Amino acid sequence: MNQLKKSFSPTEGKKDQNNLINDPQKNKQKKQKKLVDMEGLVTHNLSNGKFRLKLENGVEVIGHLSGKIRQNRIKIVVGDKVTVELSPYDLTKGRITYRHR
């Protein structure tokens, strides 16, 4: 009777699943950014670190400061040329990621 019992290990059925999770090509696809980088000019200074920007293609968007710019206390004033990340889901809002000199 003891010969008929088969021990079941909890990791036995998950070997194939772990190979799929650790597949490097799938991880690259997940981490790939879906943002659009554009350059623009600051036209207005709004409250709470938000700015009205005119992009190089003529579209006006509202952009907020990225965390690194806030941490390093980089000042952005009207007339500065900046790089903006736009989400493909809402092209009217963006994140300011770099101030050009």
Swiss-Prot record:
Keyword terms, alphabetized: Chloroplast, Initiation factor, Plastid, Protein biosynthesis, RNA-binding, rRNA-binding
Compositional bias segments (type: Polar residues): 1-10
Coiled coil: none
Subcellular location: Plastid, Chloroplast
Protein name according to UniProt: Translation initiation factor IF-1, chloroplastic
All copies of domain S1-like, residue ranges: 26-101
Pfam families documented for this protein: eIF-1a
Entry-linked SUPFAM superfamilies: Nucleic acid-binding proteins
Role, per record: One of the essential components for the initiation of protein synthesis. Stabilizes the binding of IF-2 and IF-3 on the 30S subunit to which N-formylmethionyl-tRNA(fMet) subsequently binds. Helps modulate mRNA selection, yielding the 30S pre-initiation complex (PIC). Upon addition of the 50S ribosomal subunit IF-1, IF-2 and IF-3 are released leaving the mature 70S translation initiation complex.
Quaternary data: Component of the 30S ribosomal translation pre-initiation complex which assembles on the 30S ribosome in the order IF-2 and IF-3, IF-1 and N-formylmethionyl-tRNA(fMet); mRNA recruitment can occur at any time during PIC assembly.
GO molecular function: ribosome binding; rRNA binding; translation initiation factor activity
CDD domains the UniProt entry points to: S1_IF1 (cd04451)
Major location category of this protein: plastid
PROSITE patterns found in the cross-reference section: S1_IF1_TYPE
Record-linked InterPro entries: NA-bd_OB-fold, RNA-binding_domain_S1_IF1, TIF_IF1
CC annotations in GO: chloroplast; cytosol
Family per similarity comment: Belongs to the IF-1 family.
Residue segments, region Disordered: 1-35
